[in-house]
């Protein structure tokens, strides 16, 4: 595809989604397109405004907020969408690539499409609000129904609706031929290598390797040589949607059968609550805070056997960023995320799918897996899936096949 002479505007109101926006925009630039990024001057994680400047970027003066779920945050998103719409009217781009949420951006995109019908409109849905907040009763409340419709009622305006996972497509009203899935890619870390077992079996077979002994794992036992300890990693924000009670309950049950230790890489408003609940059940843990250096993260993960990927029941998520890190570093999953992740765990046999009504059975399954001698093979399988599904190259292939062709051919 030759993008020479084409103008693309990439819009996101969330600093958390900027890596996706920057990556997509750079792909367009590589094709010769002129790219403008419209982003925010408010840093979501830190809850502060910053003076920002970069070539080919416009930073919208964004209304600050303190709470993630608040009327002020919704107003901030509405105000951002209104200002972004004015910028788009002036730019007259060949393509507008909008990252959702905010849901109010979908409404703005619809209005832009009506005014400039020759513009290609792409929505890239990275989260579902309010569905990802969980709670069936909550979803039925009138304000939340309006919030959801702010997105759903305007999806039909898009020439293409991208979702971050297949699971999201069950909840949106978009024609299948106008949808695509682009997983959030993770760049292959510097120095990364696959852990290939010596007697790797064909991919359609489940190999049985020699069991790892306690002495072989002595370096990951955090000072404990006997009995052996099963080390778990939890990576990511410690917020109101992670299943703290489920994680603690599972570790408590498992801990009655064998010693356990939890490594927590992340931070958030519920860190104190998480620490208290672990301590109350006698579960040993270490909190490292937010870690962004891949080498540090890799070193922590090298001490762990499993990665915990659990959110509260009802939260509408099919794939998490933490799970992609687990795939990258080959940590078998303790998972309760439905959709894409649940099916991968089930079909590829790369961990256990946790069910709260069968917590004891799940703990027994995990212990059997830990003692099966299959961990090395599962690590290799997970890293193979990472290379196939979650690298930048894998995501770029979809962008080339679906998005670049739209830019070249115009609206459908």
Feature-to-residue mapping (PLM):
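Nucleotide-activated donor-binding/catalytic signature segment of Leloir-type glycosyltransferases, i.e.
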Residues: 263, 272-298
């Amino acid at each position: 595809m030759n993008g020479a002479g084409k103008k693309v505007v990439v819009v996101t109101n969330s600093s958390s989604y900027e890596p996706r926006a920057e990556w997509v925009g750079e792909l367009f630039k590589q094709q010769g397109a002129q790219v403008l990024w419209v982003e925010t001057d408010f840093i979501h994680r830190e809850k502060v405004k910053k003076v920002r400047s970069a070539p080919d970027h416009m930073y919208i003066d964004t209304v600050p907020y303190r709470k993630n779920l608040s009327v002020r945050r919704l107003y901030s998103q509405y105000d951002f969408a209104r200002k972004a719409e004015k910028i788009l009217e002036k730019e007259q781009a060949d393509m507008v690539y909008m990252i959702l949420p905010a849901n109010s951006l979908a409404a703005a995109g619809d209005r832009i499409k009506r005014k400039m019908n020759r513009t290609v409109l792409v929505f890239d849905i990275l989260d579902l609000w309010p569905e990802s907040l969980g709670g069936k009763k909550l979803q039925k409340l009138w304000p939340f129904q309006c919030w959801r419709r702010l997105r759903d009622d305007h999806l039909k305006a898009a020439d293409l609706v991208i979702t971050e996972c297949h699971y999201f497509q069950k909840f949106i009203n978009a024609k299948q031929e106008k949808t695509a899935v682009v997983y959030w890619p993770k760049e292959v870390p510097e120095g990364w290598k696959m852990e290939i077992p010596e007697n790797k079996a064909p991919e359609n077979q489940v190999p049985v390797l020699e069991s790892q002994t306690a002495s072989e794992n002595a370096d990951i036992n955090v000072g404990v040589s006997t009995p052996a300890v099963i080390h778990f990693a939890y990576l990511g924000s410690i917020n109101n949607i992670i299943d703290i009670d489920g994680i603690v309950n599972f570790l408590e049950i498992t801990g009655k059968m064998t010693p356990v230790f939890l490594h927590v890489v992340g931070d958030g408003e519920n860190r104190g609550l998480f620490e208290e609940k672990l301590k109350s059940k006698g579960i040993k843990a270490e909190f490292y805070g937010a870690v962004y250096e891949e080498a540090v993260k890799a070193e922590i993960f090298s001490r762990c056997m499993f990665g915990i990927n659990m959110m509260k029941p009802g939260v509408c998520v099919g794939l998490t960023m933490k799970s992609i890190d687990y795939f990258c570093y080959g940590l078998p999953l303790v998972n309760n995320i439905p959709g894409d992740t649940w099916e991968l765990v089930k079909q590829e046999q790369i961990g256990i799918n946790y069910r709260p009504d069968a917590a004891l059975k799940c703990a027994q399954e995990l212990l059997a897996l830990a003692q099966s001698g299959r961990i090395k093979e599962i690590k290799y399988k997970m890293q193979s899936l990472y290379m196939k599904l979650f690298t930048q190259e894998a995501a770029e292939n979809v962008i080339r096949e679906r998005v670049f062709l739209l830019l070249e051919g115009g609206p459908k």
